[in-house]
Amino acid sequence: MFNIYLENAFYLNGITFAKLPEAYSIFDPIVDVMPIIPLFFFLLAFVWQASVSFR
């Protein structure tokens, strides 16, 4: 089982897990940023609560 984990970890070590088709290569920078977008909403919740004094 440990060997299976090591084999799978070998493939997941890169920053990008998949390559977009060539027709969509212009969207590569956007796709790289997309996983971070939910974190912005999470941080926005704290900024919003700070603006209303955490009521």
Swiss-Prot record:
Gene Ontology annotations for the cellular component aspect, listed alphabetically: chloroplast thylakoid membrane; photosystem II reaction center
Pfam families with a match to the protein in the record: PsbK
Alphabetical keyword list: Chloroplast, Membrane, Photosynthesis, Photosystem II, Plastid, Reaction center, Thylakoid, Transmembrane, Transmembrane helix
Keyword NAD: no
Sequence intervals crossing the membrane: 26-46
Record propeptide residues: 1-18
GO biological process entries: photosynthesis
Membrane-protein topology: Single-pass membrane protein
DNA damage in keyword set: no
PANTHER family xref list: PHOTOSYSTEM II REACTION CENTER PROTEIN K, PTHR35325
Oligomer and partners: PSII is composed of 1 copy each of membrane proteins PsbA, PsbB, PsbC, PsbD, PsbE, PsbF, PsbH, PsbI, PsbJ, PsbK, PsbL, PsbM, PsbT, PsbX, PsbY, PsbZ, Psb30/Ycf12, at least 3 peripheral proteins of the oxygen-evolving complex and a large number of cofactors. It forms dimeric complexes.
Family designation: Belongs to the PsbK family.
Protein name: Photosystem II reaction center protein K
Source organism: Marchantia polymorpha (Common liverwort)
Lineage of the species this protein comes from: Eukaryota, Viridiplantae, Streptophyta, Embryophyta, Marchantiophyta
Gene that encodes it: psbK
